[in-house]
Design a protein with these regions (language model features):
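Small cysteine-rich, disulfide-bonded extracellular modules of the LU/uPAR three-finger superfamily
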Residues: 1-101, 108-150
Length: 150
């Protein structure tokens, strides 16, 4: 699984614009035409991506994360961000036009691409078939984000 964190998101984590303990963090399911897996420069808001390629299956909706945790991992010398519950996209119609490639995590501001702030793109280890009626991103298996000593 590969992740891409926009440079602006790194700055926003440091300056407090994105607070992983208190911000409303959401997940957006994206399909295989996304550019979220390659773009990290000059991505300040969601509308700065060339193509997000949001899931287009009937019944699709972004998911608000719940049970977010930020912990210091002294054993592995890093900080971890995760959720205590899986991220589950339910009620999908099984009729998307392309397979699912990953999730785009973002800070919800007002529900518009012009103002919502990207956090990270998390790629699945393999594409999920477009016929899926539910997509589950497991929690606490690899952590959603990790900050390590350089």
């Amino acid at each position: 699984m590969a992740s891409k964190i926009p440079n602006s998101a790194l700055a926003n984590l440091i300056n407090g614009t994105i607070d992983l303990n208190t911000s409303d963090i959401r997940a957006r399911l994206v399909m295989t035409n996304t550019t979220c897996d390659t773009e990290i420069d000059a991505i300040n808001n969601l509308d700065d991506y060339t193509t997000i390629d949001v899931a287009d299956a009937t019944g699709y909706a972004d998911v608000a994360l719940s049970g977010e945790t930020v912990t210091a991992n002294d054993t592995d010398n890093r900080g971890d961000f995760d959720t205590t519950s899986d991220i589950v996209f339910t009620g999908l119609g099984g009729n998307a036009t392309r397979n699912y490639q990953g999730v785009l995590l973002y800070k919800y501001v007002d529900g518009t691409n012009a103002n919502d702030i990207p956090l990270a793109f998390v790629e699945f280890s393999s594409a999920i078939p477009k016929e899926a009626t539910q997509v589950t991103v497991p929690s606490s298996t690899t952590n959603l984000l990790q900050a390590t000593q350089g």
